[in-house]
Amino acid sequence: MVQYVTTRIDASFAALSDATRRGVLERLGRSDASITELADKFHMTLTGMKKHVGVLEQAGLVTTQKVGRVRTCRLGLRRLEEEAAWIERYRQLWDARFDELDKVIDELKQQEKANGRKPRE
């Protein structure tokens, strides 16, 4: 059986895979907020929001601090450089593949033109 090791990048992508968590990050990008404020904004229960914040916290994207009864959330110090580099590698790969596909399409159009066929658009 294959076993997979969860890495930091896996945790980040798992955290970012949910629209609510992406919204929380966007909201925290403007200013810190309590879990109660976030729950109200996203029309969720406190328990539901705590779970979302926990996932973001495990990925290092959010930090929380409890003062009295209020848990305040803020963006984590960790940036997404590793994730951006991973995405960039695949962007470059696909750009190269699409460039090659464009060349093949251009060659086929030239062949059709040379054979007297009406070129496709």
Question: Model regions: which residues?
Answer:
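Short helix-coil-helix linker/hinge
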Residues: 15-20, 80
